[in-house]
C-alpha cells in the first residue's frame, strides 16, 4: 500500500469552548518515509469524545498553544511501517489512542496500534471509551462482586461499557442515569438493574429509595448537580471515580457542593471512609495492554458489546457537527465520524 504526498487533518487554530470556531480542516504534507518504530495508519473511523472540547479550550494542556492536532481515537488500516516494527504489518486493521486522530492519515508509535479482526465502526469504541471504563473500574474503582454501582450518563460511549463490565464481568447491581425513555430501555437491555431518567425523576430521591445503605462505586461522567447527588449517597468505603464533567465543558459553570444538612464534601467522605478519585487514561499506559486483552476476550465471550450511535457523520468537515450531536444528549452509544 502507498500513501499520498498530502492529506487533510483537523487542527485547533484557537482556544475556545466552541469546537466549531476553534478548529479548521487543513492540508498537510505526508513524508515519504515512516520513522523508526512508527506505523502509518489510513484512518477510517474516528471517535468523538466529550473531552475533545477540553482539548480545544486548553483545559488539558495549559502551556500548549495553537495550532495543534486533535482527536483521540481511531480505527484504520496500516499502510506503512517504520524500521523495527514487529507487532503489526501492512494491511492489518488496528485501533489506537493518539493525539491527532481527526485526520486522513497519522503516524503513531507501534505499541499504540492494537490489531483487530475487522475494520468495523464499533471497534472505534475500544481505544478511549472502553479502555477508560475498564481501567478506571479495575484500577481506581476497585470493584468487587456484589457492589452497588452507579453510572452517570450511562448510555454514552463510555457509560455503556461501564454498565456491561459492572454487570456481566464484576457481578454488581447497576444503576444508570439517562435523559430519555428510549435510552432507559437500551440501558435495561445491556444490564442496568435500575434506570433513573433525570429529566423526569429526582436522582437524589431515587437513590434514597433504591440504595438506602448507599452506593459502593460511582462512575461519574457528568459533574455539577449530578455529582452532588451521587456523593450524598455514597456507602461506607465507597469509591467515586470521576472520569468526566460534561455538564461544565461548554458552559464553564462551577456548581458548588451542597448538602441539605450543611455537611461539607470532605466531612461526608470522611465519615464514610469513602474515596474521591480523578481518572485520566493517558496516565495508565502501563496497564493498557492487560485491559485491552481483557476487553477483546469479553467481546469474544459476548459479555460486552460495543454500541455505536445510529447517526454517523462523514468527513473531517463533519467533526464539529458530531461534537454538537454528542453535546445535545441525543446520542446513545459511541458517536463516530467516518473519515474516509
Curated annotation (Swiss-Prot):
Gene3D superfamilies: Medium-chain alcohol dehydrogenases, catalytic domain (3.90.180.10), NAD(P)-binding Rossmann-like Domain (3.40.50.720)
Listed GO MF terms: NADPH:quinone reductase activity; zinc ion binding
Domain of life (superkingdom): Eukaryota
Reaction it catalyzes: 2 a quinone + NADPH + H(+) = 2 a 1,4-benzosemiquinone + NADP(+)
Pfam families listed in its UniProt record: ADH_N, ADH_zinc_N
UniProt-listed InterPro entries: ADH-like_C, ADH-like_N, GroES-like_sf, NAD(P)-bd_dom_sf, PKS_ER, Quin_OxRdtase/zeta-crystal_CS, Zn-ADH-like_protein
Keywords: NADP, Oxidoreductase
EC number: 1.6.5.5
SMART domains: PKS_ER
Enzyme class, first EC level, given as a word: oxidoreductase
Gene Ontology CC terms, in alphabetical order: mitochondrion
Family named by the database record: Belongs to the zinc-containing alcohol dehydrogenase family. Quinone oxidoreductase subfamily.
Protein name in the entry: Probable quinone oxidoreductase
Organism: Leishmania amazonensis
Lineage start: Eukaryota, Discoba, Euglenozoa, Kinetoplastea, Metakinetoplastina
